[in-house]
């Protein structure tokens, strides 16, 4: 929940794209799924309102909170992505989460090797097309006047 309060600081940098990965720490604490979803929606909206495209990193959690919680939690990310028209990384930690060789001793946070996999396999395939769209948009606005011009002789 702390990230929602820090978004103004993020928006001061005027990001074109923000990769948002929140909710897992709340789930570890057993925070109600509806509250987690509301916080994610608030964060996405604040970023969008600040002019940033959002890529939402989906999370999954261990089953220690029960199957109902796990299923409800997993459903948050695709639902928010669809409802708020944002790009989704289905599972941000795909290929890394749960692998002791790719995570620190806390079994939650990836190692350097784990992050390398996350970036190369999970982020870049989704981020690269978004960057290309932005580059095309910048090129279009640079070559086309934003308002009609009138010449007089």
For each of these PLM feature ranges, what is it?
Residues 2-153:
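Alpha-helical cap/lid subdomain in secreted, periplasmic
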């Amino acid at each position: 929940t702390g990230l929602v309060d820090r978004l103004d600081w993020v928006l001061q940098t005027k990001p074109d794209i923000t990769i948002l990965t929140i909710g897992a720490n709340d789930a570890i604490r057993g925070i109600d799924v509806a509250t987690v979803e509301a916080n994610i929606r608030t964060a996405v909206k604040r970023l969008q309102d600040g002019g940033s495209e959002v890529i939402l990193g989906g999370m999954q959690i261990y089953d220690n909170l029960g199957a109902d919680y796990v299923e409800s939690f997993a459903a948050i990310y695709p639902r928010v992505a669809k409802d708020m028209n944002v790009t989704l990384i289905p599972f941000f930690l795909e290929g890394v989460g749960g692998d002791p060789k790719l995570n620190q001793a806390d079994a939650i946070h990836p190692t350097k090797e784990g992050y390398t996999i996350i970036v190369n396999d999970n982020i870049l395939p989704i981020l690269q097309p978004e960057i290309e769209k932005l580059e095309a948009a910048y090129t279009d606005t640079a070559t086309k006047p934003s308002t009609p011009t009138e010449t007089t002789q």
